[in-house]
Swiss-Prot record:
BP GO terms, sorted: mRNA processing
Source domain of life: Eukaryota
Biased composition (Basic and acidic residues): 170-179
Any Gene Ontology CC annotation: mitochondrion
All copies of domain Reverse transcriptase, residue ranges: 176-524
Entry's transmembrane regions: none
Keywords: Mitochondrion
Gene field: YMF11
Official protein name in the record: Uncharacterized mitochondrial protein ymf11
Length: 732
């Protein structure tokens, strides 16, 4: 047979694409060696593991190779192949089918075997991501493969396991794929072997080369570990905490794809495209006209989650015992490691509290009735009397007396209109009820019992919150500790959240002038007045309306936080913070500016943003000025502002020049010291928001009716494309 025809026939039988050819002499040991045969590397069309094909006399034998092709490292699609790898296509399919209530996912454990998923998880936790404090250190592809194999096939524990229930490979006790247990080598042999490996050129082992996005100078020596007994050296760049974080990120990426389409839109905690701001915007949109508010928070729900309840809920959506067993092992690690918001813990808790969302939505479908709020008869009669007085004489135009709180408390609303609104961010939830007080108390009892009995969680109270004295027609909305002399009027159906000494009870309340609901660092209040002019039939009227919701900054909470950091006292009076005493001016000013910008960014939805940011800027600037007054012995903060300016951008005190000989000896240190900006002239960071006009107006827009995560970004992209098209047409 002609050689050209022979090769064409072989290429036609390949699945999709020929990647590389090798002779039999370079074949691995696990592949059968046949005389006069050629081995090819190819990719399967379904994204199966890479395989070698042996052709001889028209017969074909398969031998799966455990090393990856180099093309996977570049994250680029191959010619003649669909974009994306097997795990991305599988996750897309899961995303489409997970919206069905009866859908159960299978084969999730196979996704963990794909090394590309581990590389993607490492890239997300690598330097430059948002999780700066929770990322693995420099590593290599070999380290990721070893870690993946230890998760899929845990090695036997020698000398005790880790605290997380797993035993990672340690030294010569590591069992590599297709290799036998190796004994300890002598120190001389080990050092000689490492020296030989480090002398190899960079392209000697292409299967252990990191992509450019993962390569760093610090770990360049760790890239050439290819021996089966040197897996511990490949993992030396990863600590035990780093391994746990990386494994949790891989599991989280799979679970997030499975549960994100299933979660309700009322949940905003630890979900992509959602935050505290989206939760507060939904409150501004849906809670208008709400009479009664119920606020709750579960007690340490990151650490007190019930494992049996969690696994039972996950079995409703997952039909893969191997994957569930792996998740069950990771629960212990997730609940022990790190603070809130790290690892897979928040997602697991969202899975549990999703049942609370479904329960409240069922109550909403039962209770809701009446599309539009009927007019309050008492309010309508009062407005009729006021209109008659205005028409009768001009003496009553200035002020018309009304009964106190007749409009604010919503008394006398018809019983035909009832409605429930609900939002949740992580473990904080807020329920708004439109209807009688008995309905609100009934809903409170049902929700609390569901949390304690079905989810096996406990509601908690803020111990720093002072008791509130109840008055007639004014009921507190949040949960407050109450003593025997502070209960106010007797409330029926009051029950205890937690037993034991110091019993704590729950109550419901509506917003009044002096009572506001703290939620996510904001204060939810009702607009007292909204005044505007109306001209009708040639006459001018001054209209005042109330009832809308407004979000305010919880200034006392922010001031208490600043007092803990040493910037002021509990009353908000600035004081010198000697933690910044030894730092140069540029660093201190940049740090204060970062704190102030962060507070302004978080409270950009508050109606009182400009007033509160102005006060916070005064506290932080004055605190730093008093620190510099003590440091440079200027006496008062006014003298510091006179030299440094309102924003403290000018150098307060120039550094004295060194002697010529000392400058030559310590030239590098002096240059580095000036580079940090200590007393050097030139550009220096400045504290923002020194004037009221520099603060931007708050964002008071609520969420749109059919809002979806990422909608704002898509709108910006569409506007950008439209602008570019218009420019192109104009140029043409």
């Amino acid at each position: 047979m002609d050689n050209q025809l022979f090769f064409k026939s072989i290429i036609a039988t390949l699945p999709k694409r020929i990647h590389k050819c090798q002779t039999v002499s370079k074949a691995p040991e696990n592949c059968a060696k046949m005389p006069k045969s050629i081995q090819f590397r190819g990719f399967s069309g379904t994204g199966e593991p890479f395989r070698r094909l042996d052709f001889r006399m028209g017969q074909r034998a398969f031998s799966y190779e455990r090393q990856r092709p180099l093309a996977f490292l570049s994250f680029s699609s191959l010619p003649g192949r669909r974009e994306g790898s097997a795990w991305t296509e599988r996750l897309r399919a899961l995303w489409k089918h997970c919206k069905k209530d009866q859908f159960k996912a299978e084969g999730l454990f196979r996704l963990i075997k794909d090394i590309n998923l581990w590389i993607a998880a490492y890239k997300k936790l690598s330097p430059g991501s948002k999780n700066d404090g929770e990322r693995p250190k420099g590593t290599s592809i070999k380290a990721l493969e070893t870690l993946r194999d230890s998760v899929i096939n845990p090695p036997p524990t020698l000398g005790g396991g880790s605290s997380t229930g797993r035993s990672w490979p340690k030294g010569h006790e590591t069992l590599e794929r297709g290799s036998k247990a190796l004994g300890p080598e002598s120190p001389k042999e080990t050092s000689l072997a490492l020296q030989k490996k480090r002398r190899r050129p960079e392209m000697a082992s292409p299967h252990t080369i990191l992509p450019r996005v993962l390569r760093t100078h610090k770990v360049s020596r760790a890239l050439w570990v290819v021996g089966p007994s040197d897996a511990s050296l490949a993992l030396r760049g990863l600590t035990q905490k780093d391994k746990d974080i990386l494994v949790q990120e891989v599991i989280r990426s799979i679970l997030e794809t499975l549960y994100e389409p299933y979660f309700l839109s009322c949940s905003h905690g630890f979900r992509p495209g959602r935050s505290q701001h989206t939760c507060l915007k939904q409150i501004r949109r849906d809670f208008v006209g709400t009479v009664w508010f119920i606020e709750g928070e579960t007690s340490q729900y990151f650490n007190k989650i019930d494992k049996q309840v969690l696994i039972g809920l996950m079995r409703r959506r997952i039909r893969d015992n191997r994957f569930l067993n792996l998740v069950q092992k990771e629960i212990k690690t997730s609940l022990r490691a790190g603070a809130e918001g790290t690892g897979v813990g928040p997602l697991l808790c969202n899975i549990v509290l999703h049942e609370l969302d479904l329960f409240v939505m069922r109550l909403k479908r039962i209770v809701d009735r009446g599309r539009r709020r009927a007019v309050n008869p008492e309010s309508k009669e009062l407005w009729r009397q006021s209109a008659a007085l205005i028409d009768r004489t001009t003496a009553h135009r200035a002020r018309v007396p009304f009964p106190s709180g007749a409009f604010g408390r919503g008394l006398g609303h018809p019983q035909e209109t009832r409605q429930i609104n609900y939002v949740r961010f992580a473990d904080d939830f807020l329920i708004g009820v439109i209807g009688p007080r008995a309905l609100a108390e009934r809903i409170r009892g049902l929700v609390t019992r569901f949390i304690e009995v079905r989810l096996k969680l406990r509601l908690t109270l803020d111990k720093t919150r002072k008791p509130i004295q109840s008055r007639p027609n004014t009921l507190p909305a949040h949960y407050v500790p109450m003593g025997p002399k502070e209960t106010g009027p007797k409330v029926e159906n009051d029950f205890t959240i937690s037993g034991g000494p110091g019993k704590k009870k729950t109550q419901i309340f509506c917003i009044t002038k002096n009572k506001k609901i703290p939620f996510l660092g904001y204060l939810i209040s009702r607009d007292s007045k909204h005044t505007y002019n109306l001209v009708r039939r040639g006459r001018r009227y001054r209209i005042r309306r109330s009832g809308g919701l407004s979000l305010l900054v919880d200034m006392q909470k922010v001031i208490n936080r600043l007092a803990e950091k040493g910037f002021c006292d509990k009353s908000g009076h600035p004081k010198p913070n000697f933690a910044y005493f030894q730092y140069p001016q540029s660093y201190s000013v940049a740090r204060i500016a970062s704190i102030l910008r962060g507070l302004a960014n978080y409270y950009h939805l508050a109606n009182s943003k400009r007033q509160c940011v102005t006060r916070l800027s005064y506290i932080l600037r004055t605190s730093l000025a008093k620190t510099y007054a003590a440091k440079f012995k200027l006496g008062t903060a006014a003298k510091v502002f006179a030299k440094g300016g309102r924003d403290l951008s000018k150098p307060i005190k120039a550094k004295k020049a060194r002697r010529p000989l000392l400058n030559r000896v310590l030239g590098s240190k002096t240059t580095a010291h000036r580079r940090r900006g200590a007393g050097s002239e030139g550009h220096s960071p400045a504290i923002p928001y020194t004037r009221y006009g520099q603060i931007k107006l708050p964002d008071t827009k609520p969420l749109t009716k059919n809002w979806q995560p990422g909608q704002a970004r898509l709108n910006c992209i569409a506007k950008k494309n439209l602008y570019q098209n218009c420019n192109r047409e104009g140029n043409d």
